Amino acid sequence: MAACSRGLVARPFDLTARGAAHWPCPAPRRRAIRCCCRAQQEPRRRLSKAAAAAPERTEEWRIDGNKPAAAARGRRRASLTAMPSLPFPSPRSRRQWKQQNFYPRCTPRGPAPQSRDTPPKRDTGIASEKEWGINLLDEAVKESGTNEDGSTWYRESGDDRGDNGYRCRWARMGGQSHDGTTEWKETWWEKSDWTGYKELGAEKSGKNGAGDSWWEKWKEVLYQDEWSNLARIERSAEKQAKSGAENAGWYEKWWEKYDAKGWTEKGAHKYGRLNEQSWWERWGEHYDGRGFVLKWTDKWAETDLGTKWGDKWEEKFFAGIGSRQGETWHVSPGGDRWSRTWGEEHFGNGKVHKYGKSTTGESWDLVVDEETYYEAEPHYGWADVVGDSTQLLSIQPVERPPGVYPTIDFSASSPAPPSDDPPGMPPSPLE
């Protein structure tokens, strides 16, 4: 859908199994692997047979609801052919729009603003500043108009001021068809104050004549931690889309946090539904900047008939010593449960203790000679996020008068991390 002199034109909205992507494949977040032991050969990760069942391996899960969960020994697959596919590509977003397309629509007294109303892309992580193309005006604007086909549009901008040097520059635009069935909205903003806080953000939403709706919010923040005095940059994104033709939709929440000493935290919560099938995924990464790393993934799915299945794993390492563990499980509509658990203990001396068992009687417990590999540092860290946040860093706060100092509330903590509760489908902002 685009707002122009000819009006609003809706674009297709595809949430069918054919239009969805493949699930459950984990996000290929590893771009570089660092060896933390004596080995000097080209790093590569080795997994035990049990670890191979963890969600690090790209595979297709299939469930046959007619078969009992406690299947034959070693069974690791079941099938559900209607399950939509959900790829997990790199967190670096691959959006189709370009920055230069946005600037003309915020020119005062220019043509009607052009809508960027396509639904957000799934599993594209957090977009960059350049992909959003936020361009705020230095003057207040309030305009509206009607196109030849009866569709309407509006555009406005402003500059709000507050206590403690608070400043918020913003721009808002949108439009709708003559009958109101098609609509789009978009807002940009930048915030700052005398404490050094800076924020750049955007939010957009839309709906079409078929009843499909979508919403997306993006934000990046720079602030100084009151207790450590370290600079921090945090980026986040929330995305949602719903189908108007069937019981289908998805929701994602992504976040990344960095500080100047290498502390890094990343994670995502995801939820999707296609008619009688639902699926969830949560994953997280934590680096303390001194060598400790924690990573985990938890994925599960279910059908309205009662079939459920999932896979989860976790790894912790420091100075070449650590552990990995995980579980794959399945519950049939009748309540029969099958599971396989596995674990690894890495001692840092070339010895690895591997163990595991399953509800079908499998078990193993042995010590093997094996090198230990893991990522001790994030592939995208503080230096990278600073280099990609030039627009955020260039935000100019209101000039502080001599002798006036910012008020800092030490009782307030840094923004709370996202809840561990499974994400659901929040209501559309357009409803």
Swiss-Prot record:
Residues 65-126, 403-431 are annotated as: Disordered. The keyword Plastid applies. It is found in: Plastid, Chloroplast stroma. GO terms for biological process: negative gravitropism; positive gravitropism; regulation of alpha-glucan metabolic process; regulation of starch metabolic process; seed development; starch granule initiation. InterPro entries: Alpha-glucan_binding_chloro (IPR052495). The keyword Transit peptide applies. One of its GO terms (molecular function) is starch binding. GO terms for cellular component: chloroplast stroma; starch grain. Residues 415-431 have a biased composition (Pro residues). Keywords: Chloroplast, Plastid, Transit peptide. Belongs to the ESV1 family. Binds preferentially to highly ordered alpha-glucans, such as starch and crystalline maltodextrins. Involved in the organization of the starch granule matrix, thus influencing starch turnover by modulating the accessibility of starch polymers to modifying and degrading enzymes. Required for the control of starch degradation in leaves and starch distribution in nonphotosynthetic parts. Promotes gravitropic responses, negative in shoots but positive in roots, by facilitating starch granules (statoliths) formation in hypocotyls and roots columella. This is Protein EARLY STARVATION 1, chloroplastic.
